[in-house]
């Protein structure tokens, strides 16, 4: 029954059953093989499209950047070229997210796990963001509990940083009026939790429920912004689940937004 349930989620299985149920097992295995080939074909197609888009997109970004930096060009033209460059960069990020979501969903993205000290990872991310320039309307802070200061887990540091970055960018995008962003780390004897929170516009219980059900379709709580949470939040969930973790979202209108990423079995760095 567990294997059939797994198959229903879109993941292939392999049943080894003899006797009267062997024919059923064979049928399930055949269906699993077909599903596996379909998943492989879908992931390969997305990867191919992503690769084909990157080259012309890089050319567009390069030409736009050159025009935007040409001081002899008309001011309006330079401004429009900068808009093209910025929007092209967003498309490039979306293509990368789409490819990574696909690879994680079909378990085709290799995880390069190693012992990672999470307090160091959080502080390094915050420092890099501040050095790159977060903007005057937003601020970022890091809070690490004394218990979590030396907490270490086996993870892919690049992907965990990507998840944190997507959550921070989500707070920035959906709070153009400005907000404070907080990164915190805490742990217990059973798990370690990374929390990304802000004190921005938040969302209603209904919108929160919709977001949890369809994270890649959810619209912004502020209709004037015409923003969507996009693939970013879906990618965070895929990364967390690939590490056998849990993602939980908490929010209320005008009281901020919080995402908690929980991973089991932390270890202290000796």
Task: Briefly describe each language-model feature range.
Residues 132-144:
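Short conserved segments within the C-terminal catalytic ATPase subdomain
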Residues 198:
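Acidic ATP/Mg2+-coordinating residue in the GHKL
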Residues 1-47, 63-68, 75, 230, ...:
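Membrane-proximal HAMP signal-relay module
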Residues 112-127:
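A conserved beta-strand-to-alpha-helix junction within the catalytic ATP-binding
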Residues 106-111, 150-155:
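Conserved micro-motifs of the catalytic ATP-binding
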Residues 86-91:
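Short alpha-helical segment of the dimerization/phosphotransfer core of two-component systems
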Residues 171-172:
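Short helix-loop "hinge" at the ATP-lid/N-box region of the Bergerat-fold HATPase_c
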Residues 203-219:
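Short conserved segment of the HATPase_c
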């Amino acid at each position: 029954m567990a294997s059939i349930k797994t198959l229903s989620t879109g993941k292939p299985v392999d049943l080894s059953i003899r006797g009267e149920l062997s024919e059923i097992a064979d049928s399930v295995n055949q269906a699993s093989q077909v599903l596996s080939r379909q998943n492989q074909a879908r992931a390969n197609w997305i990867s191919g499209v992503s690769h084909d888009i990157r080259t012309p997109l890089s050319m567009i970004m390069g030409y736009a950047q050159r025009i935007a930096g040409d001081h002899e060009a008309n001011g309006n033209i330079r401004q429009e070229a900068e808009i093209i460059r910025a929007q092209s960069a967003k498309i490039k990020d979306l293509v990368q997210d789409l490819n990574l979501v696909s690879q994680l969903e079909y378990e085709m993205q290799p995880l390069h796990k190693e012992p990672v000290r999470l307090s160091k990872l959080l502080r390094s991310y915050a420092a890099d963001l501040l050095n790159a320039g977060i903007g005057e309307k937003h601020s970022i802070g890091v809070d690490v509990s004394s218990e979590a200061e030396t907490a270490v887990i086996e993870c892919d540091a690049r992907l965990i940083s990507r998840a944190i970055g997507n959550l921070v960018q989500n707070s920035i995008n959906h709070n153009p009026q400005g907000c404070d962003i907080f990164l915190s780390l805490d742990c217990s004897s059973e798990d370690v939790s990374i929390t990304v929170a802000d004190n921005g516009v938040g969302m209603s219980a209904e919108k929160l429920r919709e977001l949890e059900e369809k994270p890649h379709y959810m619209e912004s709580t502020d209709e004037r912004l015409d923003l969507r949470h996009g693939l970013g939040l879906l990618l965070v969930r895929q990364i967390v689940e690939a590490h056998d973790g849990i993602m939980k979202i908490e929010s209320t209108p005008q009281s901020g937004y919080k995402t908690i990423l929980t991973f089991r079995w932390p270890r202290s760095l000796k």
